[in-house]
A protein has these predicted regions:
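Conserved, mostly hydrophobic/aromatic
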Residues: 1, 8, 39, 74, ...
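Metal- or metallocofactor-binding catalytic centers and their adjacent structured scaffolds
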Residues: 4-85
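Predominant activation on well-ordered alpha-helical scaffold segments within soluble catalytic domains
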Residues: 33-40, 75, 79-80, 145, ...
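A generic structural signal for well-ordered alpha-helical segments
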Residues: 82-83, 208, 259, 285
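N-terminal small/glycine-rich loop or linker at the start of catalytic domains
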Residues: 85-109, 143, 152
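Catalytic domains of carbohydrate-active enzymes, especially glycoside hydrolases
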Residues: 123-131
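Catalytic core of soluble alpha/beta enzymes
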Residues: 133, 138-277, 306-307, 314
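Flexible C-terminal active-site loop/helix
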Residues: 272-353
Length: 353
């Protein structure tokens, strides 16, 4: 998504929803229509003095509440534009540090143990100091134990994608002993344990009582009522932040400050996204208390070609936030020479309709 002001200055963002609603009840097809027919006309009809005002104006339209990822396809572009107007990088605009670089964090998918070891070894050799491993009940212990033996000091995060349940408590306790930084979304929300407890957040709270490792919440929190239920359990203290999921930069920033005020741990997760979205998350990693490196890795982890220039590349596990040629805003521009021949559709929405 690209926005343009009266002076021809532009800002960019990215919609990261999926083709199906497996992650959130929102799809790329729906979001395309919502951005075109609803969000773009609303934004064009408003006057903003600061990009923090955009999410508040969109919140006045109740029909948009169920489309946070669509809103996050537009709102960050206005932050990028504003950064170019005032001459500031996104990290500075949101209250982050003056850091020129951040540490990245890579993700390794589920695979045979030797393949996982090889992947982690390669990432460590590239300079990554934090790796998140996707895990499943049957192979988790073997894979994580092997990686921990190879790299005793590596910051290791585990993402179960809701694949475990209470019958695997022994496995989870053994994983806990391997000292991961957190275990993300361990429990299947549809499983009913012998105790009869059906509420997922209560179940996760009971699990947290058994582990020293933090249980981290992500896809289990979809609605405001989900958040209320989770926040009612004090020992659930770790949350993955994703800008698209919260509806843009300002809502994510608001949530970050709220969690910090409550003493919770927050860190920047990631999506199946290009360098445009990854740079937003990288900027948040400069905020106070963001002690875990974010899910920001080289664009080549997912794509043969990035959608932006300069392409998002990490060297020695580090990302330069704003290179000298792109010192403001997100720090990148769309690679239109690459995008134009690969585009399926292109729509321009203007104040003239």
């Amino acid at each position: 998504v690209e926005v343009e002001d009266w002076a021809g200055r532009t800002g960019i963002s990215e919609c990261v929803s999926f083709a199906t609603n497996w992650y959130l009840p929102e799809t790329i097809g729906e979001d395309y229509a919502v951005v075109r027919d609803s969000i773009a006309p609303v934004v064009l009809g408003e006057r903003y003095l600061h990009p923090s005002e955009v999410s508040a104006s969109l919140a006045t339209f109740p029909g948009l509440a169920k489309y946070p990822m669509a809103k996050a396809a537009v709102e960050p572009a206005i932050w990028d534009l504003y950064g170019k107007i005032v001459g500031q990088p996104l990290s500075k605009m949101i209250g982050g540090s003056n850091a020129e670089k951040i540490l990245g964090g890579a993700v390794v998918g589920i695979a045979p143990v030797e393949d996982v070891r090889a992947a982690v070894n390669s990432l460590v050799a590239q300079g990554y100091t934090r790796v998140k491993m996707k895990i499943e009940p049957e192979t988790a212990l073997e894979c994580v134990a092997a990686v921990r033996a190879d790299h005793p000091d590596l910051t290791l995060m585990l993402d179960a994608n809701q694949s475990f349940d209470e019958s695997y408590l022994d496995v989870l306790c053994k994983l806990d002993a391997l000292n991961p930084a957190c275990i993300e979304e361990p429990y299947n929300p549809n499983y009913v344990p012998n105790s009869g407890e059906r509420n997922l957040f209560v179940r996760l709270s009971l699990l947290q009582d058994e582990l020293k490792t933090m249980v981290c919440l992500d896809e289990s929190v979809v609605t405001a009522s989900d958040m209320e239920a989770a926040m009612g359990l004090d020992n659930l203290r770790c949350y993955a932040l994703k800008i698209a999921k919260f509806g843009g930069i300002q809502p994510t920033l608001d949530f970050y400050h709220w969690m910090r005020s409550l003493g919770k741990t927050v860190w920047m997760g990631g999506m199946f996204d290009t360098g445009v979205s990854k740079r937003m998350h990288a900027a948040f990693a400069t905020l106070p208390g963001m002690d875990l490196p974010p899910d920001v890795s080289d664009y080549s982890a997912y794509f043969a070609h990035d959608t932006a220039l300069p392409p998002l590349e990490l060297k020695h596990g580090e990302l330069v936030l704003n290179a000298p040629k792109n010192p403001v805003g997100l720090g990148c521009i769309l690679d239109k020479e690459y995008l134009q021949p690969t585009a399926i559709d292109e729509v321009k929405v203007t104040t003239e309709g």
